[in-house]
Amino acid sequence: MKLTQGCFSFLPDLTDDQIYKQVQYCLAKGWAVNIEFTDDPHPRNTYWEMWGLPMFDLQDAAGVMMELAECRRVYGDRYIRISGFDSSPGWESVRISFLVNRPPQEAEFELVRQEVGGRAIRYTTVRKAPAHVS
């Protein structure tokens, strides 16, 4: 099952040329770009490991693509995402975030329903155990 997080997650995986164009869009807007990776893509895990520092003041997406290639070389077995941070007054937040790398074996999650007191229902997202191959 394909993990869907961030922009473009409903589309086929982006090619490097498409990633380059999205990064160039971020830079044209004056956003800082950063690369992050994780082996725990749980929807509530918002704190991914950063690959280096955020890239401020870049003019060309080639620098980001070079760092992405190195991150893929080291952490190609994990999820990698690119984010564009807008520091302008009134925003000061991530404006775009999308996956640029997936591990060979995707993580799977399921929604567990639990009835609790007062006829309330509680839902929890849990990671499914990997399927065993016989």
Swiss-Prot record:
One of its GO terms (molecular function) is ribulose-bisphosphate carboxylase activity. Keywords: Calvin cycle, Carbon dioxide fixation. InterPro entries: RuBisCO_ssu, RuBisCO_ssu_dom, RuBisCO_ssu_sf. One of its GO terms (biological process) is reductive pentose-phosphate cycle. Belongs to the RuBisCO small chain family. Heterohexadecamer of 8 large and 8 small subunits. The basic functional RuBisCO is composed of a large chain homodimer in a 'head-to-tail' conformation. In form I RuBisCO this homodimer is arranged in a barrel-like tetramer with the small subunits forming a tetrameric 'cap' on each end of the 'barrel'. RuBisCO catalyzes two reactions: the carboxylation of D-ribulose 1,5-bisphosphate, the primary event in carbon dioxide fixation, as well as the oxidative fragmentation of the pentose substrate. Both reactions occur simultaneously and in competition at the same active site. Although the small subunit is not catalytic it is essential for maximal activity. This is Ribulose bisphosphate carboxylase small subunit. It comes from Bradyrhizobium diazoefficiens (strain JCM 10833 / BCRC 13528 / IAM 13628 / NBRC 14792 / USDA 110). The lineage of its organism: Bacteria, Pseudomonadati, Pseudomonadota, Alphaproteobacteria, Hyphomicrobiales.
